């Protein structure tokens, strides 16, 4: 039933619009909203935070069908869950309440790991975060952040203790400012 619903959604909403989204370089926010309303984008969010509490198998079935409609849409619609996984597995109760509940309500999140000089090689990232009072100051550059111009919050991977190697990496949650002037620059994409 879940797989069937995802396939029907992909056939009706995704596949007919994929070429236009690519041609116009548009983020498919309205279609993502519709997928969210059907429950296709929150299957792994635990029930206590408003999701369905299902597993990877169910999510894979959905992603496969959405990807059938358009792999680009599967990536765009999946970026929020990618940013949410670290919270599901290691977030504090406060973080889960604050961010996962927002995901269940339809917000968009972005996963910020890739860097200009490191690509997606996590071990080679150079972004650092330094504690300044109660907040962290993040210094570095991230790129290829799916949905960044539409995200309500960001998962940012940075070193808080470079000398400790991978154990000195931290996941920071950054709530998107509005307006986003100066925060983002758009790079042309081709599909």
Segments and roles (model prediction):
Residues 7, 37-106, 147-153, 165:
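Internal helix-loop-helix
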Residues 10, 62, 92, 111, ...:
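Buried hydrophobic positions in well-ordered alpha/beta secondary-structure cores of metabolic enzymes
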Residues 16-38:
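Short secondary-structure junction/hinge motifs that connect adjacent elements
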Residues 105-113:
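A short, Trp-centered hydrophobic/proline-enriched beta-strand micro-motif
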Residues 117-125:
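Active-site-adjacent elements of ketosynthase-type condensing enzymes
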Residues 127-130:
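A structural signal for short hydrophobic beta-strand segments in well-ordered beta-sheet cores
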Residues 135, 139-176:
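A short core secondary-structure module
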Residues 174-191:
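Single conserved hydrophobic/aromatic residue that forms the stacking wall/gate
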